[in-house]
UniProtKB/Swiss-Prot annotation:
GO terms for biological process: iron-sulfur cluster assembly. The keyword Chaperone applies. The gene is hscA. Chaperone involved in the maturation of iron-sulfur cluster-containing proteins. Has a low intrinsic ATPase activity which is markedly stimulated by HscB. Involved in the maturation of IscU. InterPro entries: ATPase_NBD (IPR043129), Heat_shock_70_CS (IPR018181), HscA_NBD (IPR042039), HSP70_C_sf (IPR029048), HSP70_peptide-bd_sf (IPR029047), Hsp_70_fam (IPR013126), ISC_FeS_clus_asmbl_HscA (IPR010236). It comes from Shigella boydii serotype 18 (strain CDC 3083-94 / BS512). This is Chaperone protein HscA. One of its GO terms (molecular function) is unfolded protein binding.
């Protein structure tokens, strides 16, 4: 009998047969695609040898162009040339108009308030535009590898929220790609450097791209990549350098009109060219809208210094979160084209006390890391022992009685992760429970962020505390959160996948963490008070039910003592004296002990009525 050749699920049946995978850096300004060939990760170039693909799409009635061809139309047809679409991903129209009031596009709101861009090809959302960029990258990879891709790893900023990550997945699906995983950009950079050097210790990944800034503090140990802490700014990058310089040129050239989109694009192009030139030269001559002038590196540095300082403040916060000092960081990895700016490299080197790593092209390092990970996930390296442990930036939890937040998954927990906690009903006969998912570090609901609400219905009508509900939080490798609530005895359950329409900015995250530290003592006291008030309400609710059912077991004098104790508890529970409430609860318990014993005896007698001793 011939033997059947078998293989691990998801792997090729033939040991020598490689599956085709690619890593995609879907950037704000530029995008890249990379793959692993002959054991080496490399980015793939177009027919003209260019590795970067500008993240720009130009739309016409009969089609569209992507990349360099699209970018040439930016100044001529601004309204139909979409660039930096990554900034729009997962955001509401109101949010976009507030953050980016000078975008040269016409928007309409969809039924759910999400942005639709008016183009010659019709109304398009950011997901569709991103899909067109991904299609162009996939076509480049398919041609270079002479075959269809089996899967891709796409990188996203560490601070992308659920809606932005889901939008990226939707764009890939629209482009016909199978997403193996979304990978945080700093983690991808750690893969690119860590695998080559095999170095162990703490590494900082400073990622300043076109539209986002991320700082990650990583620990590399025995093949394990663990993100100790993350920080950054989802609305800060080289684009902001460009806009600052463009505004400066506008002032120097005395161009007051901001409504002319063509002039605005010309100014931006001039600013970008000047920024690049100033990385090597001390000064550069600029020609725009009939004006000619000179800009020095010193002037440029003065313009961008406040933004660079903002990135270093985020670095300091991330180090504090990670519990490490700057001098403990062995290496600083530079990622993103904006890290070529001399002032950035200089200030980062001063902050960490060592020159940053730039041996891998900062534009390519993320795509290379994604390609290495894709090669593993597609099954080409089944023996790889590399692990990736990303973290969640803010704690996740539930609202409980009294307006308290019960944390289920603490901040900086590595993902993927699943945690569960058991809860119970508060009132007799309660058949439904509202599940309120919270995010934040404070103790009270009012001080945290609401993520989602859903209801679990069909709970058996039992006495208070009789039903047991298990609530499970699951965060997958892409940072998407699913919450499931299940009543144990019946198996009835309800769940929700959290997809906020738009997420927190880095400053809001930093503010929430800072507030949790500033108000720590106050929050603990507030929580203790709320817990005692909830317990007081539970005791009074239970006592009232018992008195309604079995008041006949008490004499008038005994009833008066219990009523007085209950009235006192009800009164002090309205105040904010934790000790007084606790003592009043103990007093009610003391005064009702005999009553509770009589009720128990009566229940036993009722249960035994009509039965002989032998039957018992």
């Amino acid at each position: 009998m011939a033997l059947l050749q078998i293989s691990e699920p998801g792997l090729s049946a033939a040991p020598h047969q490689r599956r085709l995978a690619a890593g995609i850096d879907l950037g704000t300004t530029n995008s890249l695609v990379a793959t692993v060939r002959s054991g080496q990760a490399e980015t793939l170039a177009d027919h003209e040898g260019r590795h970067l693909l500008p993240s720009v799409v130009h739309y016409q009635q009969q089609g569209h162009s992507v990349g360099y061809d699209a970018r040439t139309n930016a100044a001529l047809d601004t309204a139909n040339t979409i660039s930096s679409v990554k900034r729009l991903m997962g955001r509401s129209l109101a949010d976009i108009q507030q953050r980016y009031p000078h975008l040269p596009y016409q928007f309409q709101a969809s039924e759910n308030g999400l942005p639709m861009i008016e183009t010659a090809a019709g109304l398009l959302n950011p997901v569709r535009v991103s899909a067109d960029i991904l299609k162009a990258l996939a076509a480049r990879a398919t041609e270079a590898l002479a075959g269809e891709l089996d899967g891709v790893v796409i990188t996203v900023p560490a601070y992308f929220d659920d809606a932005q990550r889901q939008g990226t997945k939707d764009a890939a699906r629209l482009a016909g790609l199978h997403v193996l995983r979304l990978l945080n950009e700093p983690t991808a950079a750690a893969i690119a450097y860590g695998l080559d050097s095999g170095q162990e210790g703490v590494i900082a990944v400073y990622d300043l791209g076109g539209g986002t800034f991320d700082i990650s503090i990583l620990r590399l140990s025995r093949g394990v990549f663990e993100v100790l802490a993350t920080g950054g700014d989802s609305a800060l990058g080289g684009d902001d350098f460009d806009h600052l310089l463009a505004d400066y040129i506008r002032e120097q050239a005395d161009i007051p009109d901001r409504s002319d989109n063509r002039v605005q694009r010309e100014l931006l192009d001039a600013a970008i060219a000047a920024k690049i030139a100033l990385s090597d030269a001390d000064s550069v001559t600029v020609n725009v809208a009939g004006w000619q002038g000179e800009i020095s590196r010193e002037q440029f540095n003065e313009l961008i210094a406040p933004l660079v300082k903002r990135t270093l403040l985020a670095c300091r916060r991330a180090l504090k979160d990670a519990g490490v000092e700057a001098d403990e960081v062995l290496e600083v990895v530079m990622v993103g084209g904006s890290t070529r700016v001399p002032l950035v490299r200089e200030r980062v080197g001063e902050f960490f006390g060592r020159p940053p790593l730039t041996s891998i092209d900062p534009d390519k390092v993320v795509a290379i890391g994604a390609a290495i990970q894709a090669d593993i996930l597609v099954g080409n390296k089944p023996d790889s022992e590399m692990l990736l442990l990303d973290v969640i930036p803010l704690s996740l939890g539930l609202e409980t009685m009294g307006g308290l937040v019960e944390k289920v998954i603490p901040r900086n927990t590595t993902i993927p992760v699943a945690r569960a906690q058991d809860f119970t009903t508060f009132k007799d006969g309660q058949t439904a429970m509202s599940i309120h998912v919270m995010q934040g570090e404070r103790e009270l609901v009012q001080d945290c962020r609401s993520l989602a609400r859903f209801a679990l219905r069909g709970i058996p009508a039992l006495p208070a505390g009789g039903a047991h509900i298990r609530v499970t939080f699951q965060v997958d490798a892409d940072g998407l959160l699913s919450v499931t609530a299940m009543e144990k005895s019946t198996g009835v359950e309800a769940s929700i996948q959290v997809k906020p329409s738009y997420g927190l900015t880095d400053s809001e995250i930093a503010s929430m963490i800072k507030d949790s530290m500033s108000y720590a003592e106050q929050d603990v006291k507030a929580r203790m008070l709320a817990e005692q008030k909830v317990e007081a309400a539970r005791v009074l609710e239970s006592l009232h039910g018992a008195l309604a059912a079995d008041a006949a077991l008490l004499s008038a004098a005994e009833r008066q003592v219990i009523d007085n104790a209950a009235a006192h508890l009800s009164e002090v529970a309205q105040g904010d004296d934790v000790d007084a409430i606790e003592q009043a609860i103990k007093n009610v318990d003391k005064q009702t002990q005999d009553f509770a014993a009589r009720r128990m005896d009566q229940s036993v007698r009722r249960a035994l009525k009509g039965h002989s001793v032998d039957e018992v």
